């Protein structure tokens, strides 16, 4: 099994990976936060054009325009998805991820995924997020596999949710807990 994974997905290098720049999204995100009453201190960006096992999700300090932390983020396993290429949908039952602006809503716990945050979709591309039960949650699978491969093999870790490592979810929890205003999550895919 491990051998097949290495052949199919490659061994992820432990050398310094190229740094990721989210500069082109920061102005638009800050304006959205300012106009709609979101935290102007922090936001979460998810760049679906990056490989799922690499630094695809980022916590951004909007005051300094700096990246505080990054981590892996699995995409949904719905129809048309592969480990290399996500497809997107807002339809119930699609098991695909959605793009756009989301409000990070209430925190809760479940027996299946543990700590989780509900998401409210704010755009036409994700307005069914609450009905679809799209969440931010973690998976040990994502936490382990991102050390081995740049592309996370599709699994039940995500049916459209933003599934990250347990360590990254704790960092997201920390900024959500200390913020007096809701945090914006913006998911996008560059061409």
Describe the role of every protein-language-model region:
Residues 13-159, 166-183, 188-191:
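Cell wall/extracellular polymer interaction/catalysis modules
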Residues 1-8:
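Hydrophobic membrane-insertion alpha-helices, especially the h-region
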């Amino acid at each position: 099994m491990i051998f097949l994974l290495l052949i199919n997905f490659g061994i992820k290098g432990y050398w310094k990976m190229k740094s990721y720049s989210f500069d082109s999204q920061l102005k638009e995100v800050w304006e959205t936060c300012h106009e709609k009453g979101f935290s102007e201190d922090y936001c979460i960006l998810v760049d679906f054009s990056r490989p799922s096992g690499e630094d695809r999700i980022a916590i951004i300090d909007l005051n300094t325009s700096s990246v505080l932390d990054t981590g892996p983020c699995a995409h949904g396993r719905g129809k048309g998805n592969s480990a290399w290429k996500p497809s997107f949908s807002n339809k119930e039952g699609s098991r695909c991820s959605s793009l756009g602006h989301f409000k990070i809503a209430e925190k809760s716990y479940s027996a299946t995924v543990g700590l989780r945050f509900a998401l409210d979709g704010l755009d036409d591309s994700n307005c069914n997020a609450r009905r679809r039960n799209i969440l931010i949650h973690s998976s040990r699978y994502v936490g382990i596999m991102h050390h081995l491969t740049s592309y996370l093999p599709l699994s039940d870790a995500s049916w459209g949710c933003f599934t990250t490592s347990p360590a990254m979810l704790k960092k997201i929890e920390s900024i959500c807990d200390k913020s007096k205003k809701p945090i914006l999550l913006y998911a996008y895919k560059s061409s």
